[in-house]
A protein has these predicted regions:
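Short, Lys/Arg- and Gly-enriched loop/turn segments at beta-strand edges
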Residues: 111-117
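Active-site gating loops and adjacent loop-to-helix segments of metal-dependent hydrolytic enzymes
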Residues: 1-26
Length: 139
């Protein structure tokens, strides 16, 4: 959703011609409805964006947009264990257990109650551990 939102909000900056900008009008709402329909039908929904360059800063807005349509726990699962399941890496990724690859983060608050915390990682994530090594520590 965040990639579509960037295209609809910043398409002109991206160099999209007027005809393309017209085509994307309403696309965000259409995609929201698709996510909602999939959620209601218990379709596995992975989590991720393809935002690069100047627009990379908007990628974590996906948490906010998805939480408007799904429960916070389902959005978090989508970003972790569901993604692992989709790429057939259950037990290796998306979980915290011995011999699993995991990024562990320390969040200033409870994303189950306020998922918006994850939309601003620079402000709300004070520690990141990757492969057993701390790669960010602002404690």
């Amino acid at each position: 959703l965040s990639a579509i939102k960037v295209i609809t909000d910043h398409g002109a900056e991206l160099g999209l011609p007027p005809m393309s900008l017209e085509k994307v009008t309403g696309l965000f709402q259409t995609n929201q409805q698709s996510v909602s329909n999939c959620d209601k039908a218990n379709v596995k929904l992975g989590f991720g964006t393809d935002l690069l360059g100047d627009f990379h800063k908007y990628q974590n807005d996906e948490f906010v947009y998805r939480a408007e349509l799904q429960k916070n726990i389902d959005v978090l699962r989508s970003a972790t264990s569901v993604n692992a399941d989709i790429i057939q890496k259950t037990g290796e990724l998306g979980c915290i257990k011995e011999n699993a690859l995991a990024d562990i983060i320390l969040v200033a608050g409870n994303p189950l109650q306020d998922i918006n915390l994850l939309s601003k990682p620079g402000e709300n994530i004070s520690m990141i551990m990757r492969d057993g090594k701390i790669v960010k520590n602002q404690l």
